[in-house]
């Protein structure tokens, strides 16, 4: 399964094309719209979310509520585009109109300046429009399709925020994926410890008043994953490496860890490795899950536990200093619409890209043209592993 996305932040629409989805998968627009709505939610979101109410249109690859095996095309309209018709026009326009909302003051931490250098733009809006987090709308849409595949195979996925701007959220032990999903989706800030809810909201309000932004850490958990996804035979076949690349590809994400992650560097091997157990009902299990569900780049049957760190949003209402690319004079950076934090929304994006990578790996290992063959192949593999 592979996909491409296209579209600009203030262009007419966003598009994704997905190839390789098996035939026979039940899929409707509502399966996708629910996740698009979640992406637009979360405490601390700004004005753009009040303008856009994302709804997907499926224009190929689905007939009578089921996938056909053909490429699936998804579209989401940008309602805000009506205010940007001249600025984002495809055809050539008058020079005086081209300078409307022209950007020459690059924002520190954004793609503005380097994109302008790379592609030789004199208007940095060209960098801004495609590098905007608005692009993640389609990665969430693609991820929703991937999650439909996972659901048919009894694989669950959820996300929650574990750090807000340096404030760690205590997480109850031994929560199931279903419990994490339920608790996080009941929270406006996607945390499972609701005793911290108001404290974090007040903190977000304070940051907004100061014209600043905060980052944090999001955790995604995947349960019910078959043993043996990924491989140790080559560097680029390890599934944890593929997930890491997908997570760090999300706008503003700067790091990733699995299980105990960077804490491993402070511990001994006897404190980290997951002891192997066996029982007749479940087959092989682990006493702990310190490695986050991976051994040798392969899933080991334990839940995948992956965390991604998101830097503070670079667009500040009290902008940092920059330089005008035309005059080289110092200026305050350009201010575009922004939020004090987007961690709850970023969690939805992270969940989506992880789901896409896992679904793709399943389709790679259990290559099937249709859903029934896929389900049979996965069930047979699970039986084999249980009796190994």
Swiss-Prot record:
MF terms in GO: chorismate synthase activity; FMN binding
Positions bound to NADP(+): 39, 45
InterPro entries to which the protein is assigned, alphabetical: Chorismate_synth, Chorismate_synth_AroC_sf, Chorismate_synthase_CS
Annotated positions binding FMN: 130-132, 251-252, 296, 311-315, 337
Catalytic activities: 5-O-(1-carboxyvinyl)-3-phosphoshikimate = chorismate + phosphate
PROSITE patterns, sorted: CHORISMATE_SYNTHASE_1 (PS00787), CHORISMATE_SYNTHASE_2 (PS00788), CHORISMATE_SYNTHASE_3 (PS00789)
Keyword Transport (UniProt): no
Transmembrane residue ranges: none
Enzyme class name: lyase
Involved pathway(s): Metabolic intermediate biosynthesis; chorismate biosynthesis; chorismate from D-erythrose 4-phosphate and phosphoenolpyruvate: step 7/7
Co-factor requirement: FMNH2
GO biological process, one term: amino acid biosynthetic process
Physiological role: This reaction introduces a second double bond into the aromatic ring system.
Subunit relationships: Homotetramer.
Protein name as catalogued: Chorismate synthase
Organism: Streptococcus thermophilus (strain ATCC BAA-250 / LMG 18311)
Gene behind the chain: aroC
